[in-house]
Design a protein with these regions (language model features):
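Enzyme catalytic cores with a strong preference for nitrogen-chemistry domains
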Residues: 1-352, 368-377, 409
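ATP/NTP-dependent adenylation/nucleotidyl-transfer catalytic domains that generate, transfer
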Residues: 6, 23, 164-166, 223, ...
Length: 638
């Protein structure tokens, strides 16, 4: 439960139809299993206490009379168990029979939720035996049950006293399939998780639709959704059920027991902090008052994580998705640049080409933009500006890349200019400090700006999102331009986009792109080593970009605090980095992220391509003089 992770489960109850005592033992077995697994919240199938397929036996006093004693047995047995459990059962109230979910925890019957939408078409005829909760007119009732006074109604919001974000509501099977499901009101009223007790039969194509429906509902409502369907041990007289379990969070299926698979429990963790952050930032997510809170006490525990946490959250896990993502990003970037060039009536674009990844991607975008505009690639002006740290490999790759793409390329060696500048300001060339480095970066920007003035062009900056987050750019140097095509593409994704382009390129261009991909990331502002190789490697100085991109994604997208970032990174990387290494770079990230906001407050225009970006005019509006002491203190305390 700490850090917002609620361990949820959908449980199998292999019923014997109408054998309430046998089914009770099965329910208790699942509850004990969930307790041993550290589950917070357990969902069992619809009408699992009796079996869903009892048919007209639901008119029998003998069957219905066995329900309350069995429920009392379950409530009593729950006294020593940790999970909150939702059990499906038939229940009489006010002279009518309702298809219900009873929510049980630690010897308490917290509440009973009746089903609202009863299917009465095709193979289903629930209205023959049951009444809809619509007859209750949305009112909340209290009923005597198992020696307790129990809330009864569809507007119950179950709230954990020890964690504000840990709230859930309940709907049953068909409730999910209608245009306005109860879950809409429940989530608008504050429920972070929806439990669905279901008995959905298996027919061709239905599992795919069900999976899509659960995922889409969790996305639309920004909620966690636990779906638990009935077992094949239900009557097969006219239907077959499949034991289909689904656990989804905000559009992503976290865990699934596929139809007819044999899992007794399907378990994952729903991050309620993440969900509430999503609702907080989405101001169109309206709230609805009028739900009845039902408070329960569940001690906070450290949840053992089992869900997948992607170590590279910006990068899709599958090749097909990655190719689609890369193509979509390139289209957004190139369309954005095309519009800017046309609007300004620019005759050319000018960019510094270094033989590194970022300038390579920027050039590829420029080529696409000029293709879209029907203009010659020769109107793209690339400039290589060698100085003290430039290596033969990067310079050669820069020139080859330009030649392969058919763009204009020229060299302006800035060594003499920088040395003159050192002399002008009285800086010793042997002192390789920040002045030594930044003089080169600013000289390069000046050259590009002046060439753009000469040719009525736009300077295209090559820096990307990860560098902006860390402030790894020279203020008014490579930080500045007239348009920033890479500004919302993180470093980990830049690599894959270039790789994607290499895969569809002619052999000679592919060879250059692959060598660029194989080159260490470096600004090349310090002299090369004795072998002429890159001596200044960015990731040795600021840390692994995959770690920083991980921190950046979860900080900006979900508001995660340092403690949670550290915990998730340890889990996601599975021992690739030691705890000490992760913590070291987390501290660096927190410090630099706050210190370097002043650079982000005045960055050039550029296209947003993903949900995480740092534009001061769009997604990230942070004061340049905000203090990061809270974040740093928490990181230091880990």
């Amino acid at each position: 439960m700490k850090d917002g992770f609620i361990k949820v489960a959908a449980g199998t109850v292999d019923v014997v139809v109408a054998d309430v005592q046998y089914n009770t033992e099965q329910i208790l077995a699942r509850m004990r299993e969930a307790d041993a697994a550290g589950v917070n919240l357990l969902t069992l199938p619809e009408l699992c206490l009796t079996g869903y397929t009892c048919g007209d036996l639901f008119f029998s006093d003998c069957l219905l009379g066995a329900v309350e004693p069995a429920l009392a047995q379950i409530v009593e047995a729950s006294k020593g168990l940790y999970p909150v459990t939702a059990v499906g059962l038939p229940l009489r109230f006010g002279g009518k029979l309702y298809n219900c979910a009873a929510v049980i925890h630690a010897g308490q019957l917290l509440g009973v939720v009746p089903k609202t939408h009863l299917p009465n078409y095709g193979e289903f005829y629930e209205l023959r035996q049951f009444s809809s909760a619509k007859t209750l007119e949305g009112k909340a009732y209290t009923i005597p049950l198992c020696g307790q006074n129990v809330p009864f109604g569809t507007a119950l919001l179950f709230c954990c006293s020890g964690m504000q974000d840990y709230t859930f509501g309940v709907e049953l099977c068909e409730d999910l399939w209608v245009p306005c499901p109860p879950s809409t009101r429940l989530c608008a009223g504050g429920a972070a998780i929806i439990l669905n007790l279901s008995a959905s039969d298996e027919v061709i194509g239905k599992a795919d639709y069900r999976r899509m429906l659960v995922g889409a509902t969790s996305a639309r409502l920004a909620c966690g959704y636990v779906y638990c369907s009935a077992s094949p041990t239900e009557s097969t007289q006219d239907m077959v059920f499949s034991r289909h379990h689904l656990i989804a969070e905000n559009g992503t299926v976290l865990a699934e027991n596929e139809p007819f698979a044999s899992a007794s429990l399907t378990v994952s963790e729903i991050d309620v902090q993440r969900l509430m952050h999503e609702r907080h930032r989405t101001t169109s997510y309206d709230s609805v008052p009028g739900l009845q809170p039902v408070v329960f006490d569940q001690p906070l525990r450290e949840t053992v994580l089992t869900r997948h946490i992607a170590p590279n959250p910006f990068v899709p896990p599958y090749d097909e998705q990655l190719r689609a993502r890369a193509e979509a990003i390139l289209r957004i970037q190139s369309q954005g640049l095309k519009k800017r060039v046309e609007h300004t009536h620019a005759k050319t674009v000018v960019l510094g080409i270094s033989g590194g990844l970022d300038s390579t991607l920027a050039l590829l975008v420029c080529v696409r933009a000029f293709d879209l505009a029907g203009r010659s690639q020769k109107e793209i002006q690339c400039v290589t500006m060698p100085c003290f740290g430039t290596t033969k490999r990067t310079k050669s790759n820069a020139v080859k890349l330009c030649e392969e793409l058919g763009v204009s390329v020229r060299e302006v060696n800035i060594t003499a200019s920088v040395r003159q500048h050192f002399a002008d300001i009285g800086h010793d060339e042997a002192v390789h400090d920040v002045t030594y480095e930044n003089c080169q970066a600013r000289e390069r920007t000046q050259v590009l700006m002046d060439i753009a003035n000469q040719s009525c062009g736009l300077v295209i900056v090559t820096g990307e999102l990860s560098e902006l987050a860390l402030g790894w750019a020279t203020y008014n140097g490579d930080h500045m331009s007239m348009y920033a095509v890479n500004c919302s593409v993180p470093k980990t994704l830049v690599r894959y986009i270039v790789q994607y382009e290499a895969g569809s390129s002619a052999p000679s261009l592919r060879e250059v792109l692959l060598d660029i991909l194989d080159t260490p990331v470096s600004p090349e502002l310090l002299p090369a080593d004795e072998n002429g190789q890159i001596a200044q490697k960015t990731e040795d100085l600021v840390g692994p970009y995959e770690l920083h991109d991980f921190f950046l994604y979860h900080l900006l997208r979900f508001g995660s605090r340092p403690r949670k970032l550290f915990r998730m990174a340890k889990y996601a990387y599975g021992g690739k980095y030691s705890d000490a290494v992760i913590l070291h770079w987390l501290k660096i990230f927190c410090r630099r992220f706050f210190q370097q906001q002043f650079k982000r407050s005045c960055i050039p225009d550029g296209p947003k391509v993903g949900s995480v970006t740092l534009s001061p005019r769009g997604d990230w509006r942070m004061p340049s003089d905000a203090s990061g002491s809270l974040w740093l203190a928490e990181a230091e305390a880990l």
